[in-house]
Design a protein with these regions (language model features):
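Zn2+-dependent cytidine deaminase-like catalytic core
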Residues: 44-145
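Short beta-strand scaffold segments in enzyme catalytic cores
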Residues: 41-47, 168-169
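N-terminal nucleotide/polyanion-binding subdomain common to many enzyme families
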Residues: 27, 35, 135-186
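Generic start-of-chain signal for non-secretory N-termini
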Residues: 12-19
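Positively charged, low-complexity intrinsically disordered leader regions
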Residues: 25-44, 56
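Short loop/turn microsegments at loop-to-beta-strand junctions
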Residues: 39-41, 53, 164-166
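Short, positively charged and aromatic/hydrophobic N-terminal segments
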Residues: 3-6, 11
Length: 186
């Protein structure tokens, strides 16, 4: 009986993690088309009682990242809270500071990440930093959805080429125009 209760609790916790991560994915999507060359990232900060105390997303390149925006909203309520982030927090200095450092300095107790960042400047270093700071790290929550959200970014980073979408219209017999050359209504 005790094993069932623990198992049930784990399942409920997992469902909660997925619900918060879904919200983070919704936030990230708000920046679609504005973040290049950076990925779309969303972050939700949740206190011990399960209340959302901060939300943020990366609006555009050069501006604060999702984690920093969510921490700014959460303020001191971030202490001991859980951060749900759609992509591994960055670990390098660029136009902004590393998000893994910002999360640690804010006193975040746990970070739940949808997927790892394949960018060689990050590539596991953000999570390693968090673990070294004594922060619990969970990965893979809504991973498939997060990877789909940033297909363009992942293709550029891993394959060194743009993500291409092709639209092709043809007739039922596989042609792109009629015998007369008319392609207006195919």
């Amino acid at each position: 009986m005790r094993f069932f209760i623990l198992l049930e609790g784990d399942i409920l916790a997992r469902m909660t993690d997925e619900a918060y991560m879904q919200r983070a994915l919704e936030l990230a999507l708000q920046a679609e088309g504005n973040t290049s060359p950076n990925p779309m990232v969303g972050c939700v900060i949740v206190d011990a009682e399960g209340n959302i105390v901060g939300e943020g997303y990366h609006h555009k390149a050069g501006e604060p990242h999702a984690e920093v925006n969510a921490l700014a909203e959460a303020k001191q309520m971030a202490q001991g809270a859980t951060a749900y982030v759609t992509l591994e927090p960055c670990a390098h200095y660029g136009r902004t500071g590393p998000c893994c450092v910002a999360l640690a300095r804010a006193g975040i107790g746990k970070v739940v990440v949808a997927c790892l960042d394949p960018n060689p400047k990050v590539a596991g270093q953000g999570l390693e930093y968090l673990r070294l700071q004594g922060i619990e790290v969970v990965t893979g929550v809504c991973e498939k959805e997060a990877k789909r959200l940033n297909e363009r970014f992942f293709t550029w980073i891993t394959k060194q080429r743009p993500f291409i979408t092709l639209k092709y219209a043809m007739t039922l017999d596989g042609k792109i125009a009629t015998a007369t050359g008319d392609s207006k209504w195919i």
